[in-house]
From Swiss-Prot:
Disulfide topology: none
Protein name listed in UniProt: Zinc finger protein 547
Gene name of the record: ZNF547
Listed GO MF terms: DNA-binding transcription factor activity; RNA polymerase II cis-regulatory region sequence-specific DNA binding; zinc ion binding
Any Pfam family hit: KRAB
Domain spans labelled KRAB: 11-82
Function (record text): May be involved in transcriptional regulation.
Organism from which the protein derives: Pongo abelii (Sumatran orangutan)
Length: 402
């Protein structure tokens, strides 16, 4: 076996830690402190189990034969380690350098002699550290930034963005984001995907397969994440609130999309025509206008549609289905959007207001029609007569054309 690299042969706790002052520790929030505690305890347990030391004072401790420890790169320079002893032992008043050595020292007192098994002692030491960290008296805390000690492990670094992966194939998948590579093609519509799993999910849109079924209502979905989102409908929980208008949402993604109504932000742009959209799904649907692909055909009349949902709505013309019922008057509608508009008759809500005169309307189309009152009148080129609406002008012109 090749001789172990001396740089890898000895691992001390400081090799995987970054030291901060007490003042710097005070700037960390609770989540960061909890992360520090959990990572440090995990590293402590692993180093202890391997017989590795925790600091420079244990320089001569032997490493267990046949075990190599790979250390993830620390992303900030490690400052010079202080030799000041700041941690008092509550039993004998001895001063120790840090809470790690204090935890080890605590195990030497007679009342703790019952920890004859190393595993039990290590567990006790971890509890000592956890207690001290919870009290906030950690002295000079060591904030470990998401880096772990891996036994005989490797990490794979993306040269483009610096992100680290535990497996080579995960790095390869990630790098397709930078290269733009999409090696998986749908045989039905020609769409390209970065990952085979994404292609498999997409192909269900063509086959109609929906393997994930809700046990409450029986509705089925293409992928598990869609089912999980749907199930919140049954619980009624809406934990995400808009700080602007107070509206509540079931999902954080819906809240983010909604907030663009207030900010006017439209981050998704079409590379073909330059039109921008509030959410990615709207851009995806819009792209089909440029490709001209209509994959979903009606079996009754042969008409084709770009979206399965549009086909489903269209088929209600043939079936006569009206699944959306008004709970005020019992009237039914084929589209949910039409039901929402109808319900404003009962509530009196008129959300579309004219910026010129303040008059409000039930629907946006009614507002647009009204706004022509404030714009220039339409004149007939034949007789010079004026009309308020373009549609009225077109009807009038038939008098001249016959």
């Amino acid at each position: 076996m090749a001789e172990m690299n001396p740089a890898q042969g000895r691992v001390v706790f400081e090799d995987v830690a970054i030291y901060f002052s007490q003042e710097e520790w005070g700037h960390l929030d609770e989540a960061q402190r909890l992360l520090y505690r959990d990572v440090m305890l995990e590293n402590l347990a692993l180093l202890s189990s391997l017989g590795c030391c925790h600091g420079a004072e244990d320089e001569e401790a032997p490493l267990e034969p046949g075990v190599s420890v790979g250390v993830s790169q620390v992303m900030a320079p490690k400052p010079c380690l202080s030799t000041q002893k700041t941690q008092p032992c509550e039993t004998c008043s001895s001063l120790l350098k840090d809470i790690l050595r204090l935890a080890e020292h605590d195990g030497t007192h007679p009342e703790q002699g019952l920890y004859t098994c190393p595993a039990h002692l290590h567990q006790h030491q971890k509890e000592q550290i956890r207690e001290k960290l919870s009290r906030g008296d950690g002295g000079r805390p060591t904030y470990v930034k998401n880096h772990r000690v891996h036994m005989a492990g490797k990490t794979f670094l993306c040269s483009e963005c610096g992100k680290v992966f535990s497996h080579k194939h995960k790095l390869a998948d990630h790098q397709k984001i930078h290269t733009g590579e999409r090696p998986y093609k749908c045989s039905k519509c020609g769409m390209l995907f970065m990952e085979r799993s994404t292609l498999n999910r997409h192909q269900r849109t063509h086959t109609g397969e929906r393997p994930y079924e809700c046990n409450e209502c029986g509705k089925a979905f293409l992928c598990k994440s869609h089912l999980v989102r749907h199930q919140t409908i049954h619980s009624g929980e809406r934990p995400y609130e808009c700080s602007e208008c107070g509206k509540l949402f079931m999902w954080s993604s819906t809240l983010i999309t909604h907030q663009r109504v207030h900010t006017g932000k439209r981050p998704y742009g079409c590379s073909e025509c330059g039109k921008f959209f509030k959410c990615n799904s709207n851009l995806f649907r819009h792209y089909k206008i440029h490709t001209g692909k209509r994959s979903y055909g009606c079996s009754e009349c042969g008409k084709f549609f770009t979206e399965r949902s549009t086909l489903s709505r269209h088929q209600r013309v043939h079936t006569g289905e009206r699944p959306y019922e008004c709970n005020e008057c019992g009237k039914s509608f084929s589209l949910k959007s039409v039901l929402i508009q109808h319900q404003r008759v009962h509530t009196g809500e008129r959300p579309y207001e004219c910026s010129e005169c303040g008059k409000a309307f039930l629907t946006k189309s009614h507002l647009i029609c009204h706004q022509t009152v404030h714009t220039a009148a339409k004149q007939c080129s034949e007789c010079g007569k004026f009309f308020r609406y373009n549609s009225t002008l077109l009807r009038h012109q038939k008098v001249h054309t016959g």
